[in-house]
Regions:
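Exposed, low-structure sequence patches enriched in small/polar residues
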Residues: 202-206, 363-375, 379-394, 403-713
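Small-residue hinge/turn detector
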Residues: 111-114, 141-142
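Outer-membrane beta-barrel proteins
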Residues: 227-242, 298-304, 356-359, 430-432, ...
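Bacterial N-terminal signal peptides
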Residues: 30-42
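Alpha-helical interaction/regulatory segments in DNA maintenance proteins
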Residues: 73-87, 124-127, 135-172, 267, ...
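N-terminal secretory signal peptides that target proteins for export/translocation
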Residues: 1-28
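Outer membrane beta-barrel
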Residues: 231, 236-331, 445-447, 451-466, ...
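Transmembrane beta-strand segments of Gram-negative outer membrane beta-barrel proteins
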Residues: 166-197, 215-224, 258, 286, ...
Length: 713
């Protein structure tokens, strides 16, 4: 075990003395590029590019909030749909002179109080002339306005009437067509493509293909999405492994939507029904615990096993009635000719074994919701019934004994949101007919004009089988086997400085994943943001998490036994972002992580990157980044959210020692045609094998390439 001083000294020696040639060269380039950029770029005038891409930057920041320290090893979570939701919201901004509270609640950064204030201001004062007029609405400051601006617009529309539905202009109002095709591939050969099919190798090519065609207007949506994952076969152009489609009517008076095809469902606080992505604990300390429901929406993501397929509709205004019916095939591991495991969500059908069980389980689901809106909030009641055509059998491990078994499951919930002066109350209680239940109750408070706070309590019974839920908590995925108390606070020290912090105490009443007994823990985060002007932003963040975990030990008699210890992880981050001019944005980040295992073994890790966004031409955007990372082991791994192709989510987890570099080029060849190119490579200095199993690469380098073209009218 080394002391912090020894660690610091060793790291300095590593950087300045014993760096291999490649790292020393990369570090020098990193230093020179950073210093040169900061000195020279402020004096450059790029006449051909005067476009400040604040919309894309805001989407990236919102997604990065959702990805804060996300660890795909702990649980399978879907955030691709969340990315597409935000991108679509930015591409089709809401008209603040027409939308209601429900639509405004879809915007990141808005809660029920602010949405209600916007509608009241519009109805009692005057229609908005521009989005910046929102600064006059109570509770909306410059920081909030900057965050919500990309998702809002001001425009006029056709007034509804009974005869209007027969007018073609009504169905084509603000219409847009978008079609794109995407190609992605790992360039190094992976072991799965070397093995024959009979020995578990991949059946198809290493290429990932994706294409989508979508038509949308204010009142109509048509979509076709097709996808082939790496390793899956594509024998002819129409033989994609996954196809998604929908026809949807939306915003047609009291018929708020009618969807035929693929759709997602998100009700209440997500304890019972919430398909698709959701923000987890992170730097947005106030809004995150209080979910803003999205109702039933058309589903366009390539996440194959997340949404529903059938028909769904919502009717009404203050009293809304929603119903849905879904019947689709799922993929599950076979136990024998009768029983299967619970269906997987990966969507991979690459090997003969995976393809044999492809879509081998039928799933039928129906449900609905009644929601009553009152002047200061709303109440809702939701329910579903689910049936598989084959019995599902849970695993035999200690943390699997409460998992769903059988063929049928029903669930019911009631939720509320009430505004009383400076206090916003929200919550949901849910029950599944196997006897399990879950409860979440929270309060948002305005503590003066500069301070907001939120307090949330949650209890998810170990027997709570919320197979479609995604409630707020420590564990990602379906809520269950958790109790916790969350406190978040945010204070605007001035117009330039904002402080945020949360603490979350949690426990797991029964065995959780890879643990055989009840455990507990807590985590906290503190964040300071400094924005001296619109072109310069700094923030510093510290996060600490401590969770009990089991480990094996030896007693005096030499016998092995399992006991509990604390797994601790501390992370610190500093980031600076500088909009040098409308054509150049620089971003620098430094992350440091310290992890201590239950056996009291400490490990350290760091990440540092320099990022640039550059518009050499008005229609050409270049994002480039050089990252250096060094971690003692997997426990001290680091994360970084990356720019990528449109609608592609990239959150890289890095460990061991090496560098990662990427460049993303976006070129608008015409008003109706765009191209994207991403090339990335990760070079490890202390590994000759990357990954394992069918994904193993023999060598120290992994390279990726992606190409995408989009047409739109």
């Amino acid at each position: 075990m080394i002391s912090p001083y020894e660690f610091k000294t060793n790291r300095i020696m590593t950087l300045s003395v014993v760096l291999p040639n490649t790292r020393r060269f990369a570090f020098k380039v990193f230093q020179i590029a950073t210093v040169t950029s900061l000195i020279i770029f402020p004096f450059l005038e790029v006449a051909t590019a005067q476009h400040q891409d604040t919309t894309q930057t805001r989407i990236e920041q919102d997604i990065e909030r959702a990805l804060e320290e996300f660890d795909s090893e702990e649980a399978d979570i879907n955030l691709e749909e969340l990315l597409e939701f935000l991108q679509n919201l930015a591409n089709n901004p809401l008209n603040i002179n027409r939308v209601g509270i429900d639509e405004l609640l879809q915007v990141p950064g808005l809660n029920f109080r602010l949405a209600q204030n916007i509608v009241q201001y519009r109805n009692t004062q005057a229609p908005f002339q521009e989005v910046d007029d929102l600064i006059n609405v109570s509770g909306i400051g410059q920081v909030t306005l900057d965050r919500i601006r990309p998702y809002l617009t001001v425009s006029t529309g056709l007034d509804r009437g009974r005869d209007l539905y027969l007018n073609p202009r009504y169905w084509t109002e603000n219409s847009r067509f978008e079609g794109f095709s995407r190609y992605q591939q790992v360039l190094e050969e992976q072991r799965g493509y070397q093995r024959p099919d009979s020995l578990g190798g991949f059946v198809g090519s290493p290429v990932k293909y994706y294409q989508r065609f979508r038509y949308t207007s204010n009142h109509l949506s048509l979509n076709l999405t097709q996808d082939k994952d790496p390793g899956e076969p594509l024998e002819h152009p129409a033989d994609f492994d996954y196809t998604s489609w929908h026809i949807a009517l939306q915003n047609n008076g009291r018929l708020r939507n009618l969807i035929i095809g693929d759709f997602s469902v998100a009700f209440g606080q997500g304890l019972l029904l919430w398909s698709g992505g959701a923000f987890g604990k992170g730097s947005e300390v106030i809004r995150t615990p209080n979910k803003n429901e999205r109702g039933v929406r058309p589903f366009t993501s390539a996440q194959e096993m997340i949404g529903f397929r059938g028909v769904a509709a919502t009717y009404g205004n203050r009293l809304q009635l929603t119903g849905f019916y879904s019947n689709r095939q799922r993929t599950a591991s076979e136990i024998d000719d009768t029983y299967v495991r619970f269906p997987t969500e990966s969507g991979y059908h690459r090997t003969l074994n995976e393809r044999e069980r492809r879509l081998n389980l039928g799933q039928e689901t129906f449900g609905g919701r009644v929601r009553l809106q009152i002047p200061n909030g709303f109440f809702g009641i939701s329910g579903f019934h689910n049936r598989f055509d084959r019995p599902v059998q849970a695993g035999t491990l200690p943390w699997q004994i409460n998992n769903f078994e059988g063929q049928k499951l029903s669930g019911y919930s009631a939720d509320y949101r009430l505004l009383a002066g400076p206090i916003l109350l929200f919550g949901e209680a849910a029950y599944t007919d196997n006897g399990g239940y879950g409860v979440l109750a929270g309060t948002e408070l305005e503590l003066g004009s500069r301070t907001d706070a939120v307090v949330v309590y949650r209890y998810y019974d170990p027997a709570f089988q919320s197979i479609f839920g995604a409630g707020f908590g420590e564990q990602s995925g379906n809520p269950g086997n958790e109790e916790g108390f969350y406190l978040g606070i945010r204070h605007n020290l001035s117009s330039q400085i904002r402080l945020s912090s949360y603490i979350d105490q949690f426990r797991f009443p029964a065995a959780r994943f890879q643990q055989r007994q009840p455990t507990s823990g807590y985590d906290w985060l503190s964040l300071i943001e400094y924005t001296p002007n619109r072109d310069l932003r700094f923030y510093a963040l510290i996060r600490y998490k401590e969770r009990e975990e089991e480990y094996a030990d030896i007693d005096e008699m030499g016998r092995e036994f399992r006991t509990l210890g604390e797994n601790r992880r501390t992370g610190a981050r500093f980031q600076a972002e500088y909009q040098v001019n409308p054509s150049i944005r620089l971003r620098t980040r430094f992350d440091m992580v310290r992890s201590r295992s239950p056996q009291n073994n400490a490990s350290w890790g760091y990440l540092v990157f320099q990022d640039i966004r550059f518009y050499p031409l008005q229609k050409l955007r270049v994002d480039a980044r050089v990252t250096m990372f060094d971690t003692d082991d997997f426990n001290s791994r680091v994360f970084q959210f990356e720019n990528d192709l449109l609608y592609v989510l990239s959150n890289a987890m890095l460990f061991d020692r090496g560098q990662r570099m990427y460049v993303v080029i976006n070129y608008q060849a015409a008003s109706w045609l765009d191209f994207w190119l991403k090339a990335a490579t990760t070079v490890y200095e202390n590994r000759n094998v990357i990954s394992s199993g069918n994904l193993q690469i023999d060598g120290n380098r992994r390279s990726d390439i992606g190409v995408q073209a989009r047409i739109r009218f």
